[in-house]
Amino acid sequence: MAELTSMKLNAESHLLLDQPLLRMPYELSRRNFKNAQRVIEHSSANMTTSLAAATKAASKSASPDATLDSLDAMISKMQVLKRKLEGLHEEETRIHKSAKARLRHLQDLYDVNSLVDVKYDEWSRTRLSRLLVDYLLREGYSESAAHLAQSKEIEDLVDVDAFIACHKIERSLREGMSTSLALDWCKEHSKELKKGGSMLEFELRLQQYIELVRQGGETKLVEARVHAKKYLSTSGDFELLRKAAGLLAYKPWDDVEPYVSLYSPSRWAHLANLFLSTHHNLYSLPPRPLLHIALSAGLSALKTPACHSAYTSSSANASSATTSVCPICSTELNELARNVPYAHHTKSIVKNDPVVLPNGRIYGRDQLTAFNKKVGTESGWVRDPVDGIKGEAWSESEVRKVYIM
């Protein structure tokens, strides 16, 4: 159809927003593989030691009971290893299932030829559900996100469990004022954090030092000095070390910078935000919700100077013909798009002899005539190509010519 040629789908440009969709399974699979490798290496070393001890005991004509005890200990260790590997295998299977579903979801877009195809509408609704789940997870509404993912049957396309674990650690910092969970996470990802030059673990150790000094007392101050020597002295940041040492001479209620800032409870919020940014960087997740990115791009692409003009905006004139046509002029989006920049248009493309239908849509007259002739619209009447043959028909006298100033 003639009207579909101008609505051809470019799958590559659509998938720019969906790059993180495959990064998370990849990072999870890589981490799971390293965990399995670590478990096997550790267990192999233990098994080798146990086997050598059992062989040595048997060669010295040890009692049968002692030999059996050694063998039972080895079997127990092997059973523990088996359970750990089975758990890691189940996790790997789940990750592969999720990755396969995501690849299938992205491949579905390449099977769509036009923006007006019903399949594209279905695919877009699935993506919108994904973006909403991502937004809810980032805002901490994990239960609502899980229910939405389940109702839309997109559990394999979203990372509910990963975000739940992330926010558990974040809340332990922001609300619980505890560094234990975050330090466990740092230990689990120590190689990646060290490679990326992350300061998260150092900041957490510094907070532990601050809390020891805050408690006061000779015992706690001695613990603080030992802690600083063990965890802080290797940082190489002598300016920060100088400030940390200065805490020993000041109390939490002393209004002296920079020590009052180090003692401030707001540092816990700083640590929580630092953990979130570190977590998202590690798993190649964008710092902002994907819904924000999609909305910003969409609002910018549709926004025109007329949308917020005091003279021409339909938001200021309820009787405007564009009120139900322009999304930016709608009551819901007009104020939201006020500070969004205009799209950068390098060229304008206008069909020859443009005309506007009563519903506000503009087409070239030749394109409109060709479509209505092809679908067999009654002479003297026209239909909107987007609505198709089931759409409303208007008299040609209602079609107005468009003039571009």
UniProtKB/Swiss-Prot annotation:
Domain LisH: 124-156
Residue intervals of the CTLH domain: 162-220
SMART domains with a match to the protein in the record: CRA, CTLH
InterPro entries named in the record: CRA_dom, CTLH/CRA, CTLH_C, Fyv10_fam, LisH, ZF_RING_GID
Pfam families for the chain: CTLH
GO-annotated biological processes: negative regulation of gluconeogenesis; proteasome-mediated ubiquitin-dependent protein catabolic process
Start and end residues, zinc fingers (RING-Gid-type): 326-387
PROSITE patterns: CTLH, LISH, ZF_RING_GID
The keyword Metal-binding appears for this protein: yes
Family note: Belongs to the FYV10 family.
UniProt name for this protein: Protein FYV10
This protein's encoding gene: FYV10
